[in-house]
Structures are given as structure tokens and as C-alpha cells.
């Protein structure tokens, strides 16, 4: 399918427009060229963006796609009416119908979607990120009582990226610990985790995929050998079943899907969106 240029235009950082737009575009088999244009908050800046959008349409022979999050009606409508593009307006699509339904007027504050720098949510998110970094790959067993979840699984099964995603996106304090051959020989989870077994959630992975990932890191090693990967995975799954630890396979799941499943399982008291 022909590729398109996609603009993310906002009066703030553009992160909301880009996040929303990318989640929609992921449904289609295209590889768009991304152009982010933040802080478009007056008519002069709007004119510059319109010129750029129309230039892309002329050069490529097809209309760009434009996701916008702009609260100023004049600026927003100018871009919508003067651009040779498919303009997808998040405020008109979502905010205006909500205003009608709630019979309330929205704040219409510039940057409101990402105005969290002074909020408690921002503080909680930073605390969660620091916690997850300090407790990555079994580095520390201190303060595990504070953990919302402790991810366990064999090395390279997706624990670290999932932990950081949970921290950054949802303010979840996620530690992660590798299950290693010494644990299998001892036939028990690490002793430091035993008091917090109810917080544990396991990740497993297909042996072929694990071998491929490990060979990228340590090619030709026993660590990456398919037979060793099969052994570690089988032992880890057996241990998690015996210990009553919920687990899932990360083989064909995105980080977002893994995180959503974990959140549904642990049901944290607090959650940041």
C-alpha cells in the first residue's frame, strides 16, 4: 500500500496526538513518514504548518493525514479548512460531544492533555520508574514490600521492558527477577522473593524465539543454545505452576498486551493513565 506523510499537530507537545494517531495507524499496513509539529498556538504558526502540509500533498500526489489536538477554535479551524489533507480533529471528535452530553464547557486550556509536571501523578510515575530501575534483573531485594508486581522468568523473556512500561505508563512499581539454572537446581524461587510470592507474575517465551534473541547477544554460546533454552523454559514453567504464580507467554504479544494482562491480574489500588 502506498505510504503517506502523517502530521501530528498540537498546541502542546504533540505527544497525545502522536500516541493516539499511531494507535489508529497501527491498524493499517502502511509505513507513514511522521512529522510532529508542536506548539502551534497562533495563526502565523498555523499558516506555516498549512504550507508544509499542502507542499507534501503536492509533492507526493496524495493527501497527508493530519492528527490535531488544538484548543484554539480559530487556529484549529484554519488548519482544517485550508489544508489539502485528511484532518482528524480530536477535540471536535471527542471534546465537543462530551461537552454536549455533560452539559459542561471544557477547560480549553493549551497543553491540558499533558499538563502533569506538578501533579501527584507525575511524582508517582517518577517514583515508579526509579523503583523499577533499581530493581531491574534482580539488582536489589530492598524494599520489595513496596512493589506492586515482581516479574519473574528466564533471562530475555521480556521482563525489563515490561517493568519499565508499567512504571512509565501507569506508575506501577515493578521489580523483575531472572529465574536461573541455580534456582532450578535448588528447585525453588529465589529466597528473597519467597515472602512476596503473591506479588509475582511470570513471563515465559517460545524456546525458538528465546534462542534467537539470546544468539543476538551471545552467539554460539550454551546460554543461547536451543536445548538450553528449552530446559530453562520447561523448568521455569514447572516452578511457576508449582508455586501458584500466574504467567503468560510473551512470544506473540506486544508490551502493551503483556502489561494489560498483568494489570488485570494484579488489580493495583492505584493506576495512572
Swiss-Prot record:
A GO MF term: protein serine/threonine kinase activity
Protein name from the UniProt record = Putative phosphoenolpyruvate synthase regulatory protein
Cite the source lineage. Answer: Bacteria, Pseudomonadati, Pseudomonadota, Betaproteobacteria, Burkholderiales
Q: Which reaction does it catalyse?
A: [pyruvate, water dikinase] + ADP = [pyruvate, water dikinase]-phosphate + AMP + H(+); [pyruvate, water dikinase]-phosphate + phosphate + H(+) = [pyruvate, water dikinase] + diphosphate
Tell whether Kinase is among the UniProt keywords. yes
Family as reported in the entry's similarity comment: Belongs to the pyruvate, phosphate/water dikinase regulatory protein family. PSRP subfamily.
Task: Name the keywords, alphabetized.
Answer: Kinase, Nucleotide-binding, Serine/threonine-protein kinase, Transferase
Which residues make up the binding site for ADP?
A: 153-160
**Has UniProt tagged this entry with the keyword Kinase?**
yes
Purpose: Bifunctional serine/threonine kinase and phosphorylase involved in the regulation of the phosphoenolpyruvate synthase (PEPS) by catalyzing its phosphorylation/dephosphorylation.
Q: Source organism's superkingdom? A: Bacteria
Give the organism the record lists: Leptothrix cholodnii (strain ATCC 51168 / LMG 8142 / SP-6)
Q: Any idea of its EC number?
A: 2.7.11.33, 2.7.4.28
The first-level EC class reads: transferase
What InterPro entries does the record tag this protein with? Answer: Kinase-pyrophosphorylase, PSRP
Amino acid at each position: 500500500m502506498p505510504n503517506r506523510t502523517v502530521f501530528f499537530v498540537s498546541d502542546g507537545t504533540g505527544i497525545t496526538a502522536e500516541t493516539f494517531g499511531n494507535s489508529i495507524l497501527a491498524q493499517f499496513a502502511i509505513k507513514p513518514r511522521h512529522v510532529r509539529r508542536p506548539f502551534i498556538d497562533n495563526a502565523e504558526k498555523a499558516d506555516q504548518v498549512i504550507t508544509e502540509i499542502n507542499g507534501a500533498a503536492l509533492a507526493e500526489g496524495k493527501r497527508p493525514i493530519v492528527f490535531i489536538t488544538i484548543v484554539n477554535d480559530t487556529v484549529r479551524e484554519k488548519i482544517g479548512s485550508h489544508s489539502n489533507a485528511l484532518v482528524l480533529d480530536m477535540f471536535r471528535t471527542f471534546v465537543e460531544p462530551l461537552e454536549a452530553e455533560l452539559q459542561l464547557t471544557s477547560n480549553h486550556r493549551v497543553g491540558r492533555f499533558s499538563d502533569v509536571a506538578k501533579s501527584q501523578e507525575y511524582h508517582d510515575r517518577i517514583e515508579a520508574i526509579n523503583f523499577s530501575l533499581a530493581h531491574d534483573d534482580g539488582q536489589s531485594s530492598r524494599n520489595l514490600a513496596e512493589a506492586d508486581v515482581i516479574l519473574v522468568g528466564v533471562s530475555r523473556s521480556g521482563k525489563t521492558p515490561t517493568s519499565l512500561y508499567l512504571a512509565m505508563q501507569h506508575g506501577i512499581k515493578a521489580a523483575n527477577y531472572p529465574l536461573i539454572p541455580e534456582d532450578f537446581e535448588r528447585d525453588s524461587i529465589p529466597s528473597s522473593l519467597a515472602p512476596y510470592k503473591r506479588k509475582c507474575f511470570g513471563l515465559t517465551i517460545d524456546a525458538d524465539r528465546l534462542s534467537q534473541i539470546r544468539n543476538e547477544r551471545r552467539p554460539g554460546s550454551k546460554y543461547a543454545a536451543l536445548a538450553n533454552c528449552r530446559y530453562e523454559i520447561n523448568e521455569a514453567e514447572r516452578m511457576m505452576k508449582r508455586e501458584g504464580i500466574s504467567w503468560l507467554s510473551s512470544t506473540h504479544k506486544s508490551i502493551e498486551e503483556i502489561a494489560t494482562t498483568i494489570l488485570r491480574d494484579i488489580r493495583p489500588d492505584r493506576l495512572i493513565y
